[in-house]
A protein has these predicted regions:
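A structural signal for beta-strand boundary/capping segments at domain termini and interdomain linkers
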Residues: 51, 285-287
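C-terminal edge beta-strand
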Residues: 290-291
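Conserved PDZ fold ligand-binding element
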Residues: 29-30, 228-259
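Serine-dependent protease modules
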Residues: 1-212, 219-222, 240, 259-263, ...
Length: 296
């Protein structure tokens, strides 16, 4: 299977193989969602060559992350120390570890080529703040760790840009700050906690076609923070057609142009945070504060 541009299903040499890393001594293993997507059963081979049956604990398709669990002696499980992706610098040395082309426990060295890239996840949403590296990432590396020179986890190798299907010096990793936030949620409740305000947004294609800036509110859930704050969705006009709903154009002073942008800011703030929305209703601009709650 080949998908070249920002491929999340990179060319596979061995069907259904990928990489991962130990999260804790209770047997949790982190990998990419696209590595386990569609699989019925899974086995994990550790560095000591022991193999273990694995079960899926949880996953976040929108972030291309998944957590498995194996039953192995704690003495055989060495979790990776965690770094901080916000502190990364372009030019910093990084190491990619994985199983390229089925070659177990391979390590390649490179640098951080760029920060703040965006990728499309298997779930269709944007992944923000992605790390670009020239460390060789090949088929089979997906789900493996990207480390700094001190051996701390700074990202999860997820994708490559390649006309040929092999490494072209442009690889991408999900930042560890996202991993640190999501993995405990996946372990605790199988799915990520999604912060929101209780709205359904108008599809972006319709908003763009009508040259509507920001996130257009289509519906507001009853009893939600958005409803309590008085946000309005689309309304049917008497003569047919609709009145445009409120448009969210900024959150905490940061401009948002899409639902992905809005969700990203909400995720950074977290459930329980108070956010300040800049809303356009007709030609009037207003500022509204409301709390973020967990939404499905």
């Amino acid at each position: 299977m080949r998908q070249h541009l920002f491929s999340l299903d990179v060319l596979q040499v061995q069907q259904g193989t990928g990489s991962g890393f130990v999260w804790d001594t209770t047997g949790h293993i982190v990998t990419n969602f696209h590595v386990i997507d569609g699989g019925d059963s899974f086995r994990v081979r550790l560095a000591d060559q022991s193999e273990h049956a694995a079960k899926v604990v949880g996953y976040a398709a929108d972030k291309d992350l998944a957590v498995l669990r194996i039953n192995a002696p704690p003495a055989n499980l060495t979790p990776l120390p965690l770094g901080v992706s916000q502190r990364l610098l372009v030019g910093q040395t990084v190491l990619a570890v994985g199983n390229p082309f089925g070659l177990d426990h391979s390590l390649t060295v490179g640098v951080v080529s760029a920060l703040g890239r965006e990728l499309r996840s298997p779930g269709g949403r944007k992944i923000y703040d992605v790390i670009q590296t020239d460390a060789a990432i090949n088929p089979g590396n997906s789900g493996g760790p990207l480390l700094d020179s001190n051996g701390r986890l700074i990202g999860v190798n997820s994708a490559i840009y390649s006309p040929s299907g092999a490494s072209a010096g442009i690889g991408f990793a999900i930042p560890v700050d996202v991993v640190k936030r999501l993995v405990p949620q996946l372990i605790a409740r199988r799915r990520p906690v999604v912060p929101g305000i209780g709205i359904i947004a108008l599809p972006e294609s319709i908003a763009e076609r009508n040259q509507l800036e920001g996130v257009v509110v289509q519906e507001v859930a009853a009893g939600s923070p958005a409803a309590r704050a008085g946000l309005e969705g689309l309304r049917r006009a008497r003569g047919g057609g609709f009145y445009v709903g409120d448009r969210i154009v900024a959150v905490n002073g940061k401009r948002v142009q899409s639902l992905d942008d809005l969700t990203h800011v909400f995720e950074q703030q977290g459930v329980g945070a108070i956010v300040e929305l800049t809303v356009m209703r007709g030609g009037e601009r207003r500022t509204i504060k409301m709390p973020l709650v967990a939404v499905e």
